[in-house]
Regions:
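A short Gly-Trp-Pro
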Residues: 1-105
């Protein structure tokens, strides 16, 4: 699943906002999803309240967003291999929003 990050003030639901549901997915954040079908939409982490991570697949034109790296490569299903030359990180990038390679406890 491809995610992109934007400042919270730039994130706007253009339709279907009444169908969005939220749940606490970890000790450090929550996720939003479609209440009708369960499609994952976005996530927010408590230590970065000014940022929203959202699924690129939810965009009307997802091809306008190009990936810059892969995270959690150690969890990749062995038969799924991409042929790009993008950097791969076992977990988070070390500079991912100050997480230093792992989310806080």
């Amino acid at each position: 699943m491809v995610f992109a990050s934007v400042p919270e003030g730039d994130f706007v639901w253009t339709r279907g906002a009444d169908r969005v549901r939220r749940f606490k997915s970890s000790s450090f954040g929550h996720r939003e999803y479609c209440g009708d079908c369960g499609t994952p939409f976005s996530m927010k982490v408590d230590h970065q309240p000014e940022t929203v991570d959202f699924s690129v697949a939810t965009l009307d034109d997802p091809e306008r967003v190009a990936p810059g790296f892969h995270i959690f490569d150690v969890s990749r299903i062995p038969w799924f291999e991409t042929k790009d030359a993008l950097p791969r990180h076992a977990r988070f990038r070390k500079d991912t929003r100050g997480l230093e390679g792992t989310p806080p406890d």
